[in-house]
């Protein structure tokens, strides 16, 4: 059942549930997989559920109920929660490995997983070359996080140019005049800033650097936008694997700054910053500000390729991002891919509460219908779609 997420003052076309919704420096270890057990039986090269068919998502013919995926760490918290609830509801098992967007793209291209996940959308040309489709699942936000004594979550204000200058190494101390000018009520230390960044290929990095390139000509000219970049502060900073690794480093390194998906900041009780957006307003990360940034017409985005950073909407969070799923259009294992679509069909239908609880923003019914229509391009050897969404 799909319904209104929030009373958000943004117009809605083909966008979000928020609108018009009907009913030391050793790499830290992290548990980066999400999996739920299932009661299954093997049928050919796929696994189908033996659960009683009390739900449209259970025990359907030619739909695998044991699927694997890999990729972005940005959505890992919601995919883990969805996986657990999907298992409880249907008996299906989803094993998702949080390895970074680059790894997810490589694995789906190599056909070693049933679906890939990336926060850096593939271009229409890249999708065509790889024989893939992509569709977004939720919108979230990339947030700067800091570890400064006495600075509470949301208290430190930064603008895009200052954030870029920190990661360029131009601003190296917390009491730099540019930071102090925006934070007259804070006592900031005369201490060196340690930058923390991703060491793996990352969609979170893609969106972070895309934002910095839009607000800083120096960043655009010297570093650019990508899932991996040459960090100007690498000699004095630290690289963490996944959002998990960045969170861990910032948590234990005083006077550090990093960037993670908002759920990681909340789950780890970390201090995020406020950011000045393109409209000139200092905003806090929240479902409302993410929704404001994602208020776009997805029907006009070829291949659903869209980067939503630096929105000019008045209350938009400046580093908002959609996260995407990748599957093959002509899969060698159609039952497995049907299982993937079944899982995300369930998530679109049943998973809004989970998403909202973690401050991700689900999509509107209209947008979801558009995404599901794209699934018709995923066909078996008989030329027919491998999956028909539940009614």
Show where each model-derived region lies:
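C-terminal motif of bacterial Sec signal peptides marking the signal peptidase cleavage site
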Residues: 14-18
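Bacterial N-terminal signal peptides that target proteins for export
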Residues: 1-6
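Flexible loop/hinge segments at secondary-structure junctions
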Residues: 20-391
